[in-house]
């Protein structure tokens, strides 16, 4: 926002706000809206951005709502796929990891269904994609070996140990993308990750020319700048 000539009112520590006194989210949003032209909201509770948007007189940008959605990440992910693979033909995209709690894959799966994309989903038992986000054409696996050679995009996301039940803890570390997988993968495929990573994506793959996750991260700045421009200017063309 600053690079675009605007300013930011950061609120990272709620102990200094009325939230610490018991103020509800809706009243907090009404207060912040009186000082700003837009609110970027990250909240631990699923659905928080929708509640905020229902009462806010200014635009709400959802920067992540618990295990719900992460729309701006999905937009930069879509841009990355468009730039490195293309969306003008039928492509295959693999989503791997904790698909139950991974808000980035929730939003991305919604966007990809607007294109000619077949989704391949790889997750530990108990961490599958929520049923409302699946489709009968999806391919579902428990091992990446079953589909790594068939896909154009390998989108890896971490198992979120802070959110999973104790009986699923043994899944940690079992869902990794390895150099051995990439031997089987297409030469034109790409590796993506929303970051941060833990052990599901080893640094030994960073030098693989198919690894685009650091570029993906950099695109985030430009895509989010474009979102602000779209909100604040009617004259800016908005298309991929």
Explain the meaning of each model-derived region.
Residues 2-82, 199-201:
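Phosphate/diphosphate ligand-binding glycine-rich loop within oxidoreductases
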Residues 59-64, 140, 211-215:
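Short hydrophobic/aromatic-enriched beta-strand-loop microsegments
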Residues 2-5, 83-157:
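Glycine-rich phosphate/diphosphate-binding loop of Rossmann-like nucleotide-binding domains
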Residues 188-189, 194-240:
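Adenosine-phosphate binding glycine-rich loop
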Residues 132-210:
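Rossmann-like adenosine-cofactor binding region
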Residues 11, 63, 122, 157, ...:
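Generic beta-sheet signal
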Residues 19-21, 69-76, 130-132, 151-152, ...:
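Short, charged, surface-exposed secondary-structure boundary motifs
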């Amino acid at each position: 926002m600053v690079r675009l000539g605007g300013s930011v009112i950061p609120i990272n520590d709620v102990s200094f706000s009325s939230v610490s006194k018991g103020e509800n989210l809706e009243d907090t949003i009404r207060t912040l809206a009186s000082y700003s032209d837009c609110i970027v909201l990250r909240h631990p509770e699923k659905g928080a951005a929708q509640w905020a948007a229902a009462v806010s007189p200014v635009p709400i940008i959802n920067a992540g709502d618990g295990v719900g959605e992460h729309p701006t990440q999905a937009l930069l992910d879509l841009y990355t796929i468009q730039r490195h693979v293309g969306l003008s033909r039928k492509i295959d995209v693999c989503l791997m990891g904790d698909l139950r709690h991974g808000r980035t894959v929730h939003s991305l799966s919604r966007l990809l269904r607007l294109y000619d994309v077949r989704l391949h989903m790889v997750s530990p038992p108990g961490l599958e994609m929520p049923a409302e986000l699946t489709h009968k054409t999806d391919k579902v696996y428990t091992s990446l070996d079953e589909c790594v050679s068939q896909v154009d995009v390998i989108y890896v996301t971490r198992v979120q140990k802070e959110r999973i039940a104790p009986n699923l803890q043994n899944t940690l570390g079992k869902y990794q993308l390895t150099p051995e997988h990439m031997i089987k993968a297409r030469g034109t495929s790409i590796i993506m990750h929303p970051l941060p990573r833990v052990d599901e994506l080893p640094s030994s793959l960073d030098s693989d020319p198919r690894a685009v996750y650091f570029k993906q991260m950099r695109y985030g700045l430009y895509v989010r700048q474009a979102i602000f421009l779209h909100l604040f200017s009617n004259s800016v063309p908005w298309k991929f």
